Amino acid sequence: MKESLRLRLDQLCDRHEELTALLADAEVISDNKRFRKLSREHSDLNEIVDVWSKYRQAEEDIETAESMLSDPDFKDMAQEEIKENRALIEQLEGDLNILMIPKDPNDANAAYLEVRAGTGGDEAAIFSGDLFRMYSKYAESRGWRIEVLSENEGEHGGYKEVICRVDGDGVYGRLKFESGAHRVQRVPATESQGRVHTSACTVAILPEVDVDTTVEINPADLRIDTYRASGAGGQHINKTDSAVRITHVPTGVVVECQEERSQHKNKAKAMALLVSRLENAKRAAQETATSEMRRDLVGSGDRSERIRTYNYPQGRMTDHRINLTLYKLDAIMEGDLTELLDSLHREYQADQLAMLAQENGG
């Protein structure tokens, strides 16, 4: 193992000890926000510290066994112990490499899911509805909660646009590779000739960020409009102007929330979405400025990048980033995304390991 990696692992162990002491401090315990933040950092380090401890113990066991090789009575046993511990070290080093992949601090957060109809008119809107239902079913299977913030329904079903908040354990980390253009090939219900049409929708996944600790927003930069919210066909029409639209004038970012009957609640939810959008834009700009914007194998998350095709006549789904084709489209559209998302995460992990090896000259 490289000396630089050993040094980093020792530093992480020191930090873990420091966090253990801090979490027992009465002042920290009384500060709920700080306590939660430090608890999460402590939890993230637990496995690394445990594996590194086992690695060092295996090295010590090899040293002890090597000192016994000169004794004929213990030579065979010592050789066997050396062999076993070398195999263990190889396995633990692989585990440590994976654990040392930089974690996205937003992975544990809730997320905003945005689905928009692209090319294809009514059929694109209908497919937006199908995608939203697919994600809703998956969220339900994970015990996550979905809260619709705004929706613009299509004339013949589905959505021109739907934006929701998905709350639960590790939502953003699980869904973040879904951003991009999703293409569908199928025969629309309105097609009398049986011809296959191609339509597209875009999906964006944004991590929810803490309103108090991120970008500062000058109230003077905001234009806040209220309007009367209404659903298709006159459903849940509000008789007061409770829907809220907030425009961040310097950037032109616009957010809306119309689902609550209370204008105050709609404004609070719209502000939370605005902060997440601005923070996401800021982070993307920083990454562009500080790196070569290397496009990972799994993709950049650019919503214009075509990432997936859903082919109904063939019953298949193809993810173009990792050349994965699954012939179980019906199950996928019912929310069975585990195999797909696991494959994307494995590919991303392999990509990150290759990057680390390159950076470490190996």
Curated annotation (Swiss-Prot):
SMART domains the record matches: PCRF
Keyword Protein biosynthesis attributed: yes
Alphabetized InterPro entries for the sequence: PCRF (IPR005139), Pep_chain_release_fac_I (IPR000352), Pep_chain_release_fac_I_sf (IPR045853), Prokaryotic/Mito_RF (IPR050057), RF-1 (IPR004373)
UniProt modification remark: Methylated by PrmC. Methylation increases the termination efficiency of RF1.
Pfam families hit by this protein: PCRF, RF-1
GO cellular component: cytoplasm
Modification type N5-methylglutamine: residues: Q235
Organism superkingdom: Bacteria
GO molecular function terms listed in the Swiss-Prot or TrEMBL record: translation release factor activity, codon specific
Localization in the cell: Cytoplasm
Keywords for the protein's UniProt record, in alphabetical order: Cytoplasm, Methylation, Protein biosynthesis
Family: Belongs to the prokaryotic/mitochondrial release factor family.
Annotated function: Peptide chain release factor 1 directs the termination of translation in response to the peptide chain termination codons UAG and UAA.
Protein name: Peptide chain release factor 1
Protein's organism: Acinetobacter baylyi (strain ATCC 33305 / BD413 / ADP1)
Gene label: prfA
